[in-house]
UniProtKB/Swiss-Prot annotation:
PANTHER family reported in the protein's UniProt record: 1,4-ALPHA-GLUCAN-BRANCHING ENZYME
Assembly: Monomer.
Species for this entry: Xanthomonas euvesicatoria pv. vesicatoria (strain 85-10) (Xanthomonas campestris pv. vesicatoria)
Protein name: 1,4-alpha-glucan branching enzyme GlgB 1
GO biological process: one example: glycogen biosynthetic process
Pathway(s) of this molecule: Glycan biosynthesis; glycogen biosynthesis
One Gene Ontology term of the molecular function aspect: hydrolase activity, hydrolyzing O-glycosyl compounds
Family classification: Belongs to the glycosyl hydrolase 13 family. GlgB subfamily.
Keyword set, alphabetical order: Carbohydrate metabolism, Glycogen biosynthesis, Glycogen metabolism, Glycosyltransferase, Transferase
Keyword Glycosyltransferase: yes
Entries under InterPro entries matching the protein: A-amylase/branching_C (IPR006048), Branching_enzy (IPR037439), GlgB (IPR006407), GlgB_N (IPR054169), GlgB_N_E_set_prok (IPR044143), Glyco_hydro_13_cat_dom (IPR006047), Glyco_hydro_13_N (IPR004193), Glyco_hydro_b (IPR013780)
Classification via Pfam families: Alpha-amylase, Alpha-amylase_C, CBM_48, GlgB_N
Function: Catalyzes the formation of the alpha-1,6-glucosidic linkages in glycogen by scission of a 1,4-alpha-linked oligosaccharide from growing alpha-1,4-glucan chains and the subsequent attachment of the oligosaccharide to the alpha-1,6 position.
Residues the record marks as active site: 411 (nucleophile), 464 (proton donor)
Length: 732
């Protein structure tokens, strides 16, 4: 034993350091705690508030009792110059033996820190956050957080009674990262960071921005994630994904809110339960993809996920991160792609989140004219800061690489692109050239899309962008933003307004039906009938349709027929596929009982058949981005509210003729010019009895007559059903 060298221990404590440790203010705990060289070997200091006694257990088994210091919880003593040790701690409730967190050197490599500071660490959650690791044979968790302006950071959790005095962290100055390896802490541990700002003021405890797992709301703690990787079984899907998601492939997306698609006994399904029920349904309906409203962890369920704080953690509302991986895996095994809504524009002001994270505007702009979004009461990311843009890009890569997600739908792009978005004069700051474009965001989006294309080939990036900003889907090399697709908000607004008009007035708004083809090839588009169109007093898709009950259903069927044959990928929000009559309510499940009603079941059958038609006929998807794939046949018959157009595929693909009558008046002998003679099959009719229609049509086929019309030598005399869409294709 070395008790003889303990007489001078009380003189080894600096009063200022003792006070700073006791008040959880010391910014360099490693300078005080742990074992430091001394005249007699090493002098060990520990600070374990609440402990009754502490000993050092040396590698050779010798036990050195540490003397109590000048403050409760402080213990110190002399150790030999060499050799390891463990701490044996006596707590009021028992004894614990563990390694000393302050016996370990710096954890993150200089290269990691360089990548973090440059915003280029694509596996950011492998460096920052909470990672279960083994250091010098000791198992534990390495905590690391970016907080360059904090004067002190400690990790607090259920492993230290949430005591900010227990585990102050080490600052790695070159990157502004604080780190600490805490032995014996493993998966499932709850934790936060306790920070002091640059002037020493204590901040609210913060959740980990890079945590891979979070506590179920309303809890706000982060959780140490299980490091065991998911065992994927989707090799076949991943090998063919690039082909399945190519520009000339069909893409029909079913958008869902995971918490309200189906509820059992008033409760959300978990990821496994959702997979059990959703995947067979999506496959049966013929959708090629599901799109999940944001699954990143978010504090307020009423935001639907669009105000996230945990950009690396699938929300705990539906289970564990591995549960989410299992869901994606099972989708892939059934040939269904998974797109996730992702929010890099803004974040909520919750005290435990990113707001004023280290006592300064770290993730957000300091000036509210740049950093505060009044429409949503949220803070706006500073995309011009390397570490922030790198944080966001790493979040995107986390979902695309770790979870095999097939694409991201980037939310609120327009709000990022323009400095004056939703602001009046004097409420925004111009760019360096005096303009309204946000150059920093443009650079961020370009780099994001370049990184995705380089590191996750075959994944798609989709922009929700509601303005005419040029080149959203153009290549970055050609001055574009580099997205694969863009939501066609113009098509959606125009056609929904048209469809909501009484048919007697539609002749005066015919351009709303046809105008989309003027710009249809300026970008690569998705036609979105999303959740945004069935909330906030807009009513349901069915509820927008005019007329009596029969006409509303017929209008809806005709509108869906128009959507699925118009150039552009398809997106349909859950409930729209069976004509939900009320607005979507995120607190309730969909009204599935309505499928007992043949009218709603008919709409569902129609959408199922439209999906199969869309996939079966290349003319309906192969040339969505090529003007050669579309030709108006009748685009100017405003008086009858009739449109007709040809969709054309690649060489050898049969053309498809689409004719839609947007009035309740049956058109007999309506002649349409066609490019070839012979018989044309009626392969779809929205007025079919199986869909709930009146069963008026063309008896399954029509023979072309040698009567020129619309620039063609032959034409078809057609019966156009009321408020109906028909699709024909030549035999052979």
């Amino acid at each position: 034993m070395m008790s003889g060298v303990m007489t001078a221990v009380s003189n080894r404590w600096d009063p200022g350091a003792v006070r700073a440790l006791a008040e959880a203010r010391h910014g360099d705990a490693f300078a005080v705690l742990g074992a430091h060289p001394s005249d007699n070997g090493r002098f060990l200091r520990t600070y374990l508030p609440g402990a009754d006694r502490v000993s050092a257990v040396l590698d050779d088994g010798q036990v050195v009792a540490l003397d109590a210091g000048p403050e409760p919880g402080l213990f110190a003593g002399e150790l030999p110059a060499h050799g390891g040790y463990r701490l044996r701690i006596g707590w009021p409730g028992g004894e614990q033996e563990t390694a000393d967190p302050y016996a370990f050197g710096p954890q993150l490599s200089d290269f990691d820190l360089h990548l973090i500071s440059e915003g280029h660490h694509l596996q950011l959650a492998d460096a920052l956050g909470a990672n279960v690791v083994e250091v010098d044979g000791v198992r534990g968790t390495r905590f690391a957080v970016w907080a360059p302006n904090a004067s002190r950071v400690a990790v607090v959790g259920d492993f230290n009674s949430w005591d900010a005095r227990r585990h102050p962290m080490r600052l790695r100055h070159q990157a502004g990262v604080w780190e600490l390896f805490v032995p014996d802490v493993g998966p499932g541990a709850h934790y936060k960071y306790q920070l002091r700002g640059p002037h020493g003021h204590e901040l609210p405890a913060k959740a980990d921005p890079v945590a891979r797992r979070a506590e179920l709301a309303p809890g706000t703690a982060s959780i140490v994630a299980d490091p065991t990787p998911h065992q994927w079984s989707d090799d076949g899907w991943m090998a063919t994904r690039a082909r399945r998601q190519a520009h000339d492939a069909p893409m029909s997306i079913y958008e869902i809110h995971a918490g309200s698609w189906l509820r059992e006994a008033g409760l959300d399904l978990d990821w496994d339960g959702l997979a059990d029920r959703l995947i067979p349904y999506v496959a049966d309906m013929g959708f090629t993809h599901v799109e999940l409203m944001p699954v990143s962890e978010h504090p307020f369920g009423g935001s639907w996920g669009y105000q996230p704080l945990g950009l690396f953690a699938p929300t705990a509302r539906f289970g564990t991160p591995d549960g989410f991986a299992r869901f994606v895996d099972r989708c892939h095994r059934e040939g269904i792609g998974v797109i996730v809504d992702w929010v890099p524009a803004h974040f909520p002001t919750d005290a435990h989140g990113l707001a004023h994270f280290d006592g300064t505007a770290l993730y957000e702009h300091a000036d509210p004219r740049e950093g505060f979004h009044r429409d949503w009461n949220t803070l706006i990311y500073n995309h011009g800061r390397r570490e922030v843009s790198g944080f966001l890009i790493a979040s995107a890569m986390e979902f695309l690489q770790r979870y095999h997600v097939d694409g991201l739908r980037v939310d609120a792009v327009a709000s990022m692109l323009y400095r004056d978005y939703s602001r009046n004069a004097g409420e925004w700051i111009p760019n360096i050239h005096g303009g309204r474009e946000n150059y920093e965001t443009i650079a961020f989006l370009r780099r994001l899309n370049e990184v995705v294309r380089e590191h996750t080939p075959g994944a798609v990036m989709i922009a929700e962008e509601s303005t005419a900003f040029p080149g959203v889907t153009a290549d970055v090399a050609h001055g574009g933003l580099g997205f694969h697709y863009k939501w066609n908000m113009g098509w959606m607004h125009d056609t929904l307004h048209y469809a909501g008009l009484d048919p007697i007035y539609r002749r005066y708004h015919h351009g709303e039906l046809t105008f989309s083809m003027v710009y249809a090839y300026s970008e690569r588009f998705v036609l979105p009938i999303s959740h945004d169109e069935v909330v906030h007093g807009k009513g349901s898709l069915l509820g927008r349709m005019p007329g009596d009950d029969w006409q509303r259903f017929a209008n809806l069927r005709a509108y869906l027929g128009f959507m699925f044959t118009h150039p552009g990928r398809k997106l349909l929000f859950m409930g729209c596929e069976f004509g939900q009559p009320t607005e979507w309510n995120h607190d309730a499940g969909l009204p599935w009982h309505l499928l007992d009603d043949p009218r709603h079941r008919g709409v569902q059958t129609l959408v199922r058949d439209l999906n199969r038609l869309y996939v079966q006929y290349p003319a309906l998807h192969a040339h969505d981005d090529d003007p050669s794939g579309f030709a108006w046949v009748v685009g100017d018959d405003a008086g009858n509210s009739v449109v007709a157009f040809l969709r054309k595929g690649k060489r050898g693909d049969a053309p498809v003729l689409v004719v839609i009558n947007f009035t309740p008046v049956v058109q007999h002998g309506y002649r349409i010019g066609v490019p070839q003679g012979g018989q044309w099959r009626e392969v779809f009719n929205s007025d079919a009895g199986i869909y709930g229609g009146s069963n008026l049509g063309n008896g399954g086929s029509v023979t072309a007559e040698q009567q020129s019309m619309h620039g063609h030598a032959q034409s078809l005399p057609l019966l156009l059903p009321p408020l109906g869409a028909i699709v024909l294709t030549p035999y052979g």
